């Protein structure tokens, strides 16, 4: 057991129930870990007393039973971890690997990240996305505040790669809810849709998407329709 030092706590490092111990979350954006960083963290972890690395179902890895100094070191090694909830968005592997996947869910997530980075959009108010390549639950789209699952959309009588937008899901205890279909958007328009949503959120006083949606659901539905 280490000495308690709560100055170490931040969005990735948190205190455990055991006095003086901390855990570190490593959530690489899109679930794609930097192999060198991950191996370096694991190589360091095996030299420590009773420290474990546990894989989470949302593409994150947790290093547990760390002292404050050890937690700082692990966080430093894995500094490519997602910096906010939006960057912690999850997707299944998608159609490039999955034999029954309809669309490339992981590719969509990467396209979204790349587009918003290129545009210099502040993503701190956007929620975590949950993206599945098909109606199955591998990307847990049903529980996302914003979820997507792979689909097809006819545009000028031609089938286009698209994703069904699922609205209002929740995994939080006491407010558990499966989201409902709110639109069908061609995949190439989704990054621009999220750019527009982020710009609206950043101009609003509400602290995050969930709070904004409570009083602006009509505006949100209109935005979805504008991109359908």
Question: Where in the sequence are the language-model features?
Answer:
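Mobile "lid/hinge" segments at catalytic clefts and subdomain interfaces of large enzymes
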Residues: 147-206
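Intrinsic, low-complexity N-terminal interaction/targeting segments
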Residues: 6-10
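Short acidic (Asp/Glu) and glycine-rich catalytic loops that position anionic groups and cofactors
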Residues: 18-22, 54-57, 86-94, 167-179
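Short glycine-/aliphatic-rich beta-strand segments at the starts of folded cytosolic domains
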Residues: 11-32
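Generic alpha-helical secondary-structure signal
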Residues: 74-77, 193-196, 212
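Radical SAM enzyme core and accessory elements
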Residues: 201-203, 209-228
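Small-residue-enriched alpha-helical segments and adjacent helix-cap loops
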Residues: 27-158
């Amino acid at each position: 057991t280490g000495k308690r030092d709560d100055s170490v706590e931040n969005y990735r490092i948190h205190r455990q129930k055991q006095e003086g111990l901390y855990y570190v979350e490593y959530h690489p954006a899109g679930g794609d870990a930097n192999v060198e960083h991950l191996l370096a963290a694991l190589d360091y972890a095996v030299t420590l007393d009773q420290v474990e690395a546990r894989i989470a179902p949302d593409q994150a890895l947790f290093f547990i039973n760390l002292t404050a100094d050890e937690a700082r070191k692990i966080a430093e090694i894995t500094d490519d971890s997602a910096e906010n909830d939006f960057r912690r968005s999850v997707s299944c592997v998608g159609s490039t690997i999955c034999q029954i996947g309809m669309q490339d869910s992981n590719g969509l997530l990467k396209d979204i990240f790349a587009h918003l980075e290129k545009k210099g959009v502040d993503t701190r108010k956007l929620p975590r996305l949950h993206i599945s390549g098909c109606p199955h639950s591998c990307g847990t789209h049903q529980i996302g505040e914003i979820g997507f699952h792979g689909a097809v959309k006819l545009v000028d009588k031609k089938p286009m790669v698209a994703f069904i937008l699922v609205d209002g899901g929740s995994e939080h205890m006491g407010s558990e809810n499966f989201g409902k279909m709110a639109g069908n958007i061609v995949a190439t328009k989704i990054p621009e849709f999220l750019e527009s949503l982020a710009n609206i959120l950043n101009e609003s006083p509400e602290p995050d998407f969930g709070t904004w949606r409570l009083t602006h659901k009509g505006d949100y539905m209109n935005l979805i329709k504008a991109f359908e």
